[in-house]
Design a protein with these regions (language model features):
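Glycine/proline-rich active-site loop of Rossmann-fold NAD(P)-dependent oxidoreductases
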Residues: 138, 151, 163-173, 207-220, ...
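Amphipathic terminal alpha-helices
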Residues: 291-299, 303-330
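NAD(P)-dependent short-chain dehydrogenase/reductase
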Residues: 147-200, 207, 237
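Catalytic helix-loop patch of NAD(P)-dependent Rossmann-fold dehydrogenases
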Residues: 84, 114-162, 183
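N-terminal Rossmann NAD(P)H-binding glycine-rich loop of SDR-like oxidoreductase domains
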Residues: 3-22
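Mid/C-terminal beta-alpha module of Rossmann-like enzyme folds, strongest
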Residues: 211-276, 312-316, 326-329
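NAD(P)H-binding glycine-rich loop region in Rossmannoid oxidoreductase-like domains
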Residues: 35-36, 43-84, 92, 112
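Conserved Rossmann-fold NAD(P)-dependent oxidoreductase catalytic core, especially the SDR/UDP-sugar
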Residues: 88-132
Length: 330
């Protein structure tokens, strides 16, 4: 296949590209800044339709990872990248005869704030999704799946909490907060969460690309299928980075309410940095969110190759390999 990968400089995007190249696909990438891949590279912003058209032209398949991520920031930035950008990539795919389209979504598109215990992949709901990122990704998912047709097989994959060596998003933010003393246990820390090691997520996206003609129009959540208490996950990440876990505990209601206040203060200030706590972060740290993976594994004919234990061993080895001056991966 001639596959275009958008957002290829991200941790997950890079892992996807590696797999496609290794198996012999003709891969090109679309991203905002140049990377070291050595592949056919298109530079630009997904909000620029002309740039998107140039990138998509000639591709027979697209994996769309490019997105504005984060828990804070102006709606206009999320809208431009995650809604307008998706409209542009989907529109170009339709215009240039692309046959397979994988939209990389998030379980947050169907999360309304309550605990998720063995949950299925519920429908994306922009009206109830929590925060600008989730709302914009929900709208993007609807745009992508609405394009599914006999001519273009479109599927949405929702990897949950992707992490691995070199990660500047989930791992980077956790380590940054731990170093600053801003990583408390919210509630008891016993809520179960399920994460996804980056190589497993990449394998699932490639499987979705291969199965797209059979599963077009569907949304699937992808995880390691190994729920663990949130405190255990955080502690293992912090220990892998050579830091001591925090012993500070904050009741859930206090963390949630304080986070809501902090969000409003930071919004009024126009700060581009995350507040010490947000209501969404409190929900992520204080409520369960793990998913039934039976349908995903059956439909994709995929299963995780890297266990949590192996992933944490690799993470610790990576932290040990980087110079002390490079220890701040954010």
């Amino acid at each position: 296949m001639r596959v275009l990968v958008t957002g290829a400089t991200s941790l997950l995007g890079g892992a996807v590209v590696e797999r496609l190249v290794a198996r012999g696909d003709d891969v090109s990438v679309f991203q905002r800044r140049s990377g070291p891949s050595g592949l056919s590279e298109h530079l630009g912003d997904v909000a620029d339709r002309d740039a998107v058209d140039r990138a998509v032209h000639g591709a027979t398949a697209v994996i769309h990872l490019a997105a504005r991520v984060g828990v804070t920031g102006p709606w206009s930035e999320y809208e431009a990248a995650n809604i307008v950008g998706t409209q542009n990539v989907v529109g170009a795919a339709q215009a240039f005869g692309v046959r397979r389209f994988v939209y990389v979504s998030s379980p947050s598109v169907a999360h309304h704030g309550a605990s998720l215990v063995g949950a299925p992949a519920g429908p994306a709901d922009p009206d109830r999704a929590r925060g600008n990122y989730a709302r914009s990704k929900a709208q993007g998912e609807l745009i992508a799946l609405d394009a599914d047709s006999p001519d273009l097989a479109a599927v949405a994959i929702r990897p949950h909490l992707v992490w691995g060596p070199g990660d500047t998003q989930l791992i980077g933010r956790i380590v940054e907060r731990a170093r600053a003393g801003r990583l408390p246990t919210v509630g008891t820390g016993a809520a179960l969460i399920d994460t996804t090691y980056v190589e497993n997520a990449a394998d699932a996206l490639v499987a979705a690309l291969d199965r797209a003609p059979e599963i077009g129009g569907r949304a699937l959540v992808v995880t390691n299928g190994q729920p663990r208490p949130v405190r255990e996950i955080l502690n293992r990440i912090v220990l892998a980075a050579g830091l001591e876990p925090s012993r500070v505990r904050i009741p859930y209601r206090i963390a949630w309410g304080g986070g809501l206040i902090a969000e409003r203060i930071w919004e009024r200030r126009g700060s581009d940095r995350d507040p010490p706590m947000t209501s969404f972060l409190a929900e992520q740290l204080g409520t369960a969110h793990w998913f039934d993976q039976r349908e995903t594994r059956e439909v994709l004919r995929w299963s995780p190759a890297v266990t949590l234990a192996d992933g944490f061993d690799r993470l610790a080895a990576w932290f040990s390999s980087i110079p002390p001056t490079a220890g701040d991966i954010t």
